[in-house]
Amino acid sequence: MPRSLKKGPFIDHHLLKKVEVAAEKNDRRPIKTWSRRSMILPEMVGLTIAVHNGRQHVPVLVSEEMVGHKLGEFAATRTYRGHVADKKAKR
């Protein structure tokens, strides 16, 4: 269920500060964050945010279509290696 409109979007304060500083200085370096739960705001468009997936930080270039989604949606946490083939079927 989506968040109530009267509450507004959730974003961690430390991430919001980093985004404001990067936008003010016109800094292009990636912003490293562990906050997968934060929502993407219009102020983040054009910035690169390195989102932690549990093992490493995945760089995500924020575009206008991403506004309103959460950062964690763009950094996959699981790797799919395919189904294991049956050894008897190969013979």
Curated annotation (Swiss-Prot):
GO annotations of cellular component type: cytoplasm; small ribosomal subunit
GO molecular function: rRNA binding; structural constituent of ribosome
Keywords: Ribonucleoprotein, Ribosomal protein, RNA-binding, rRNA-binding
Record flagged with keyword Cell inner membrane: no
Role, per record: Protein S19 forms a complex with S13 that binds strongly to the 16S ribosomal RNA.
Family classification: Belongs to the universal ribosomal protein uS19 family.
Database matches in HAMAP family: Ribosomal_uS19
PROSITE patterns named in the record: RIBOSOMAL_S19
InterPro entries: Ribosomal_uS19, Ribosomal_uS19_bac-type, Ribosomal_uS19_CS, Ribosomal_uS19_SF
Superkingdom of this protein's organism: Bacteria
Identification of the protein by name: Small ribosomal subunit protein uS19
GO biological process, one term: ribosomal small subunit assembly
